[in-house]
């Protein structure tokens, strides 16, 4: 599975050949460095670990510092693994850039969604709420959360107030509209999870085949 780590820069509008406006999200993809290679014999699965973003050594834990020194690589702030059938074609220290994708490819994008803090049921679960008429005290309340004698408990998964957002969210089958390799920019059709400057993980779509198979597949 081809993939790369990037940073969400924001949204803008581009135009296709026929003049149609397309809302796109701009992602700075890479450059990423192959920090570690995992194989089936030693680790039980095949994958590569990519590093993205510079960081000072004083901000790292000792096991991380040891990993970077052993590989003789510059420390990276963000590390993510990408599983694949065979990782033998990659070497530690190899650099991956935005051009691993091409315009027309479909990708899956994963990132932490925006945190909304403590939210009620109307905002968190899209409940209708109660009547807003004169004399009503129900308004934005959740209402009943279960019966009395049976089941005499709250059903698992019942929508209730609580912390909203800041969860790992994946949107599938987003189309790559444009690639700018010189600037390491990928323009993705539509919106993606996370706030501006959020770290995102881009992988080839698992439910759609891209036009051209990449060597990482």
Swiss-Prot record:
Functional description taken from the UniProt entry: One of the primary rRNA binding proteins, it binds directly near the 3'-end of the 23S rRNA, where it nucleates assembly of the 50S subunit.
Cellular component GO terms, alphabetical: cytosolic large ribosomal subunit
Lineage top rank: taxon: Bacteria
Keywords: Ribonucleoprotein, Ribosomal protein, RNA-binding, rRNA-binding
Membrane-spanning segments: none
Leader sequence segment: none
Molecular function per GO: rRNA binding; structural constituent of ribosome
Record GO biological process: translation
Oligomer and partners: Part of the 50S ribosomal subunit. Forms a cluster with proteins L14 and L19.
Gene expressing this chain: rplC
Protein name, entry field: Large ribosomal subunit protein uL3
Protein family per UniProt: Belongs to the universal ribosomal protein uL3 family.
Species whose genome carries this gene: Brachyspira hyodysenteriae (strain ATCC 49526 / WA1)
